[in-house]
Amino acid sequence: LSICAHPRLALPVAPAPPNVRRHFLAWERPLAPQAAEWLSAGWNGAGPLDLSRLLVVVPTRQSGRRLREAIAVRAAALGKAAFAPHVLTPDRLFSAEKKEAVASRPEMLLAWSEVLRKMDPEEFREVFPLDAAARSFSWALRLAETFLGLQATLGEIGWRMADVLSLSAGPEWVLPEEPRWRQLAELERRYDATLRERGRIDVQAARASAARNPEVPAGIERIVVLATPDPLPASLSVLAAYAKAIPIDILVFAPESEADSFDGWGRPLPLVWRRRPFPLAGSLPVASAAGAPECAVQSVCRVELCADPAAQAERAAAIAAGYEAPDGLIGIGVADPDLLPVMESVFGHERIAVFNPEGRARSGEGLYHLLSALAAVSREPRFSAVEALARCPDFIAFLQARLGAEFSTKAWLSGLDELRNGNLPQDLASAMTHAGARGEKSTVALGLAEIDELARILSAGTLADGAAAALGRIFAGRRFDLDREGDARLADSARAWAEVVSECSAAALGLRASEGWELALRLFGSTVRTDEKPAGSVELLGWLELLWEDAPHLAVVGLNDGRVPEAIVGDAFLPESLRERIGLRSNETRFARDAYILRAIAANREGGGRLDVLLGRTSETGDPLRPSRLLLQCGDAELPERIALLFREPELSGRNIAWSRAWRLRPPPPAQPLAHVAVTGLRQWLACPFRFYLRRVLGMGPVDPEKREMDDLDFGTLCHAALEAMARDERMRDCTDAPALREFLAWALEREVRSRFGSRLVLPLVVQLESARQRLGKAAEIEARERACGWRTLEAERRLEISIGGMTVVGKIDRIDRHLKTGRVRVLDYKTSDTALPPEAAHLIRAGRKTSAAREFAKLEAARGTLIWKDLQLPLYLEALAREFPEAACGYFNLPKAVGDTGIQLWESYSPELHASAMRCAEGVCGAIRAGDFWPPCEDIDSDRDEFAALFHHGAAASIDWRGAP
């Protein structure tokens, strides 16, 4: 079978050329020492071990490091030095020639972006059937990465997009979507032309040229392909060409009895490995499928099911913790790269040092987030971007150094929260205006001024100059010690950023600053930082590294379907049938590769070792996962038991046990009894004494860091301000003209909005402002009608202070009206809740299950049963005015969402008996507050109405150790 049907590259076929010989290394023994021994065959230790004329091809860079270590150990055992061989991964066999003007990644991205933004979409409807919402630089850059990825995939066989069209020339096979590939080829042609205009060549084009015209590296006399079960197809083309000049040895990590399971290049044969049973410990004896070789091995592989990624990581950490010195005794394989962050976190929590040889993407580093925040402020200083920068630890450290003793992190962050929640600023300019109104020397005002200066610096010059100046300003006062791990990492990241900026600056001629930032950040975030391996640390090895792990105990996490075997699903351009046709690595070849790796790492631990395979039931996002299909490779008789084993319920780990609080919290007692309480505070105490304590005594309350619109309190305050202005304005006091009143209220509302939020409003605020206009417009009609009937506002926003139960109760009465003819008085409170509620229903509730904890003083026996006071607002207003207006009525002026329900609703049934009961309740509440009685809590508050719900998962009583409580 040909590796590739295309004649242009003339890729080698199996069997391999005569000068390519296979050799087998026993998989019962560790691979690296065997390889070192094989490579040094014939060396007697008389001189240094000289392998410098040897080229060794290994699957990964980490396996290359393992090989060099093994060679050094072998030479050192005889007290000799070693000259290491040249070690390459398969893709390096046809790397682009340095003498060619190969384009950098920024240059390639920008060339594609230019082509995509200049093209006429009508010419490429097979590729772009729908028009983009905006053909912006961001859109083009995302697509550029997609096309570079497609080029890289085709580059595995040394092809370009136009080469795919050659498949349509033969009658034996029809190329699917030929018009689409023709348009893709035209786009690639324009891309190549764009690079040529700049004196550059695409990296994949250069690699394809190198694969077609290979030259044996100078000084190399022999090539060894070592335990590489999945080489790139184009690398085999290069090796076949090399084989005409020098010998090539293929070292297969398997016994010679498995020779028929591999092709001439040492690749597992799909027809063999897809039928190879894999034994599990505790399973029935393995019955081979028809025609498959017998598998008479006692498995050392144990399978454990875990609920989720954290459970897998905890189990792996527990296995490693069983060794006093795990390095060298236990190996950890990570088949699913998505598990790496949680693995590192859990192992760190357990104080087990780990090392990820693949490194970490810089997108997770503090410098990347600082740069991203600077870029956002430079591009468009929205307040969300300002907040992101303001909360960066490096920026906070800068403010501390810049402002000195005047700076407080708490004041800075809490001030930003107050600014967002109180003023909803849209951008930096409006935030500075509002902060300045609070005080020019406030921490927030000074900090925002520093951000404004950084924004000016960033916009003043080029990307390179602006970024360097901004970072220089931020870190100017910081002393770095490169012996400290954190400082050394920051310095390394800064060097990497400088290199990226230099590349982008050289390539990004004509780009706007914001586009340059986007390009540089995208490239910087994708770069990888590699660290030195800490002494004694456990390596977190990728799946392809596991053949080289020689620890007797190996634990592999994430062996779920889709990860092992690795699967390609839903490729937009290269479906599985096309991949197989052109010789790309397919799902079938990956299945064979991974089946072989699993079998080899199990065989390597027979006779005293152990292999633990950990599977997840769900992903980090909660999506269900299936066990790897490799674990279902067994005979028909065993299949039911195997399914039961792999799909059983996962064992409970420590984190899966039902949550319970480790200890109950002990809140501090009040420093001194409260002397004042707001009218609304009594309502809060009646709802829950303990939550009153949290809010009114400790001053606790939630902060919404994502607040984008007014909450109910903000909306009510806004409407109140407009209505208060109407009541206080001399011209409006006696006005009975509804349009005039409506116009005044709209003006007063607009003035209040500008005062609080500025002239530039976010969209949600604009919508809420329109709702307020509609409600106030209807209120103007009601007000005009009431005035025509003889009612006038006597006083607005009257302050009250009354002594009850040894406490001073304070508040504000929204308005007091008097009738011109009758002299009757009414006390009204504005209500802007979405639904209009009658005063009685707002103050009293029928006794029931949810009121079982109500105090006796809050109860009222009525003809319709026992009622419970839940609010005392209107009764307290009447009590405050009792001497001045003993016959006053009370009620609400409702301004609900349904403007048709707008109107004045009096408490018609209010009586002296109700008032006396309300005052008894007020005396009881104030006495309880004065005595520090804030227990027990109410546990029947709906979670969506409870601002402290997140603190008490099983209720407040189960979470709090209250003083003197049972």
Predicted regions mapped to residue ranges:
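Polyanion-engaging groove/track-forming segments
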Residues: 1-733, 746-759, 767, 787-791, ...
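RecB-family 4Fe-4S metal-dependent nuclease core
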Residues: 660-966
